Amino acid sequence: MERYYQKEIECASQEQIKAWQDERLVRQVRHVWDKVPYYRAKMEEKGVTPEDIHGRDDLYKLPFLSKADLRDAYPFGLLAEPLEKCVRIHSTSGTTGKRVVAFYTKEDIDLWNDCCARALAAAGAGPEDVCQVAYGYGLFTGGFGLNGGSQKLGCLTLPM
């Protein structure tokens, strides 16, 4: 049986997927340039501006963040949205130093749940299924995403 959650995404052509990726990368780079001074400074160090990024072929131009960068920016230095738009925080335990934190907006969570729902649908899950989510529900985001994704599919969800 064919099963889809978001058929227009799941059945998109390679050309369409690449076009979406290029469009979203350009938009995201502009967003972090405008909203995240820490990352903007990293881009400026490399001599890169949003105008230099036209799509996936330009990824090599962008600076990558290390775990040290994530720690240096702790806790709010990489926020791309105002704190009042954030609805969830996940964090590492900090056993090797400062915690690494990730803040999520409602839109972030919806996108993650949709991504997990597409993966589960591709595996054949649907409303008649019980989905046991054996990932932890602690600081790791996996359990929450699969929980939300299985619920979006209408599965009976069993968190462990």
Regions found by a protein language model. Give the residues of each.
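Nucleotide 5′-phosphate-binding alpha/beta core
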Residues: 1-91, 96-114, 118-122, 126-128
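AMP-binding/adenylate-forming
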Residues: 106-118, 130-160
